[in-house]
Amino acid sequence: MTVSTFNRTWAKVIVNALLRYGVKHFCIAPGSRSTPLTLEALQLQQNQQAQCHSHFDERGLGFFALGIAKVTNDPVAIIVTSGTAVANLYPAIIEASLTHHKLIVLSADRPPELIGCGANQAIPQQGIFADYPIAGVNLPKPAEHYNAGWLVATIEQACVTQSQQGGVVHINAPFAEPLYEADENAINTHPWLKPIQSWLINPQTKWINSQTIQSEVSMHENWDYWRTKRGVIVVGKLPVEQGIGIKAWAETLGWCLITDVQSCVDANLPYADIWLSNNTVHQRLLQADIVIQFGGQIVSKRVNKFLEAFKGEFWQVDEYSDYLNPFAHHQTRFVAKAHHFLRVHPPLRQKPWLLEPLALSQFCAGFIEQQVGGSLNEASLAHHIEEVLATSGNLFIGNSLFVRLVDALCKLPEGYPVYTNRGASGIDGLIATMAGVAKGSGQPTVGVIGDISALHDLNSVSLLNKISHPCILFVINNSGGAIFDMLPVEAQAKEQFYRLSHNYEFAPIATMFGIEYIRPFTWADLKAKLKLAYGRKGVTIVEIKVNDQDGSNLYKSLVKQISQAEIA
């Protein structure tokens, strides 16, 4: 068998192993060295066993794969060629690692004899992602003296680890030339495949049958005591299904419930980032005996300040064993899904122990509405974000100022899917991630990002052309990084090295990539144009042009005024 043919046979085993562990999407960047992997992934697509997606920019491709992984909860494979193509995946790998979303990187490589000798496009790729992957496999150059069962077992063991822990797997696969003109008939019939033939012909068969014994969460030995005390529940980022029941549980206990915009839990105390600025309410909330936090990645600065200041009994509930303790609490940790924790900790019905947060939250609702006003700007879009969402769809929120405005100013529908990149909270790859969420879900998706984030990920606008159902990408153009207006930095330095003000507009970008574009000036204009946008296939870019400091100034003003409100 020729080298090119055996390369394909070897790659066939790799991609078929991934199928057994739920991979349904292969995201492929162009490249020659990865040809065996690419062609075998395409064979799976031809057999209707997987979908293949392509993009010319590996950084965007990684985030596109991450978006698909977020919305499907399935592992997503990424195929790239050798060299810096691999390194361009790093930001997405970091984000996926921190949020436990499942990515499998298949990086093609030069064979070992071409590493470290000046050969073209050859860099050391083993361990290139440091400790971020939960499993790394550095395969040898394809050779018949390696048992086919060994290759299957090696790939599957990495997938087993991922299925238990989430996160990223990196499989580095060297291929020697020639890479083309394989004998298509011989790829599937080589005697080397005989030991795994029954495995190959049955896509449901796994080489490694691993059964994870799930340890059930047990009721805390002192729960009967703590459920009679004064409590606060803080809900961070959670999958939709885990948030079900938390609100009713909190109401039965009579405890204060503070929810993050990523929690998918209906807030009975919305606008916490605003009302917690009031020191009187903040101090009274600190009188709680116990705080239970579900999930992590809290957006609100003032909620985090409350958590930092609290010195009582602290419980942390999260399905992963990550160390989520930025304030070094003396804590009790439950490695459990939120709804499993609720099931074994029945509430005791009590009256609410603290009414001031509810009163101030209700006051904030009207006060925010009054202060935001009727103009179309980033603050009013954040406050009324529900009005631009599809009934059944997704919301993807970028980072920097807008996610803080949404967290502080809006009240989302119970259980509405919200996606973010808050693992490392970077601004890179946001358009690509939103495109992945839209593509993976097949549902109308609204994304909202800032202008600097959009400029940072312009290449990924081309990914929006892959979406055939109605989706909306809002670009909030405040002529620079408005989040930095919050910083106490000298004006000239802030302008030149933080805000990076510009005069760019996004209509020419939409034209270049063939994307529908609108720029509304009023809410009536926006709603009329959104009705048309939801009625056609594909993505519409909506640019909201605002004064550079309006959003940050309103945010600071709301915080200041509520902080000074007198509470009886």
From Swiss-Prot:
Pathway(s) it belongs to: Quinol/quinone metabolism; 1,4-dihydroxy-2-naphthoate biosynthesis; 1,4-dihydroxy-2-naphthoate from chorismate: step 2/7; Quinol/quinone metabolism; menaquinone biosynthesis
Assigned EC number: 2.2.1.9
Catalytic reaction list: isochorismate + 2-oxoglutarate + H(+) = 5-enolpyruvoyl-6-hydroxy-2-succinyl-cyclohex-3-ene-1-carboxylate + CO2
Enzyme class: transferase
Cofactor: Mg(2+); Mn(2+); thiamine diphosphate
Details of cofactor binding: Binds 1 thiamine pyrophosphate per subunit.
One GO molecular-function entry: magnesium ion binding
Domain of life (superkingdom): Bacteria
Pfam families to which the protein is assigned, alphabetical: TPP_enzyme_C, TPP_enzyme_M_2, TPP_enzyme_N
One GO BP annotation of this record: menaquinone biosynthetic process
Keywords carried by this UniProt record: Magnesium, Manganese, Menaquinone biosynthesis, Metal-binding, Thiamine pyrophosphate, Transferase
Family statement: Belongs to the TPP enzyme family. MenD subfamily.
Known partners and oligomeric status: Homodimer.
Biological role: Catalyzes the thiamine diphosphate-dependent decarboxylation of 2-oxoglutarate and the subsequent addition of the resulting succinic semialdehyde-thiamine pyrophosphate anion to isochorismate to yield 2-succinyl-5-enolpyruvyl-6-hydroxy-3-cyclohexene-1-carboxylate (SEPHCHC).
Name assigned to this protein: 2-succinyl-5-enolpyruvyl-6-hydroxy-3-cyclohexene-1-carboxylate synthase
Protein source organism: Actinobacillus pleuropneumoniae serotype 5b (strain L20)
Gene symbol of the encoding locus: menD
